[in-house]
Amino acid sequence: MKRHLLSAGDLSRDDAELVLRTAAELRELADRPIKKLPALRGRTVVNLFFEDSTRTRISFEAAAKRLSADVINFAAKGSSLSKGESLKDTALTLEAMGADAVVVRHGASGAPHRLAHSGWVRSSVVNAGDGTHEHPTQALLDAFTMWRHLGQGKEQSLDGRRIAIVGDVLHSRVARSNALLLKTLGAEVTLVAPPTLLPVGIDTWPVETSYDLDAVLPKADAVMMLRVQRERMSGGFFPTAREYSRRYGLDGRRMATLQDHTIVMHPGPMVRGMEITADVADSDRSVIVEQVTNGVAVRMAVLYLLLGGSEPAVSTSSTNEAEE
């Protein structure tokens, strides 16, 4: 893998499949009494979050700790950032602390790229979400979840699998990263949204688009629902929440039209009753909770591979060492 993970588009198929295979090894730790490995002992991982986050920050923290890394959580609120300190000065502070990896979430698209290529830090940089641009580790954990449920053949290939991503594509960094990564892995992606929630330039994405959810659902192998990000909206993108749910929400009636093997996904946080009803979110088809579990394994794999992992991630000797 490259030194940084900034975009899902930076990953070759070999890179992506290496992450998925490594995550599969590390996923087994979730079922063990002792969940730690010594792989990153002595390394320091900094979680630098300029935006609020629950799942992603906790997931990266758990991932680093399970690899025995030292973890520093650095939130904008309550730090010098809230007093006007620049990204550069914050980066220089992290460099002085000896950070080996910086996991950054920022409201400005391109901030992780700036941090990685500015020369301010020598550490690996992982994009944990930048504005409406990208969220590559979310795409990796989504692909890993699909890989476990829908993978075909010895290599568990996603070639030809049809994935529907439904909702607020315009403001979704998850949709963009998934579109790029799933194309790399051979899947066919259809974005379903009202015209007002599709970005300018969508015709350049490696996807198909549709305004008709009912026409897309029966053909899909996986359906990913997206939250309407009202905090990023300044105008009216649809008439009412009720009208949006009627046309683009996944409810029990629509779930009944899915193929028997089709899974239902959501990157979170969910708004139950808006884009997805409670009965669908809690159904046997839903893998939403599993996505969270898989997220830790995938982020462990990313940190392990970026920080120099070349041997198998899990071995008997390393497990025994962690238990001592």
Swiss-Prot record:
Keywords tagged on the record: Pyrimidine biosynthesis, Transferase
Binding site for carbamoyl phosphate: R55, T56, R105, H135, Q138, G268, P269
Its EC number(s): 2.1.3.2
Residues annotated for L-aspartate binding in this entry: K83, R173, R227
Entry annotated with the keyword Ribosomal protein: no
Biochemical pathway: Pyrimidine metabolism; UMP biosynthesis via de novo pathway; (S)-dihydroorotate from bicarbonate: step 2/3
Single GO molecular function: aspartate carbamoyltransferase activity
UniProt cross-references to SUPFAM superfamilies, sorted A to Z: Aspartate/ornithine carbamoyltransferase (SSF53671)
One GO cellular component, as annotated: cytosol
Similarity-based family: Belongs to the aspartate/ornithine carbamoyltransferase superfamily. ATCase family.
Function as written in the Swiss-Prot or TrEMBL entry: Catalyzes the condensation of carbamoyl phosphate and aspartate to form carbamoyl aspartate and inorganic phosphate, the committed step in the de novo pyrimidine nucleotide biosynthesis pathway.
UniProt name for this protein: Aspartate carbamoyltransferase catalytic subunit
Species, as recorded: Nocardioides sp. (strain ATCC BAA-499 / JS614)
Taxonomic lineage of the native organism: Bacteria, Bacillati, Actinomycetota, Actinomycetes, Propionibacteriales
Protein encoded by which gene: pyrB
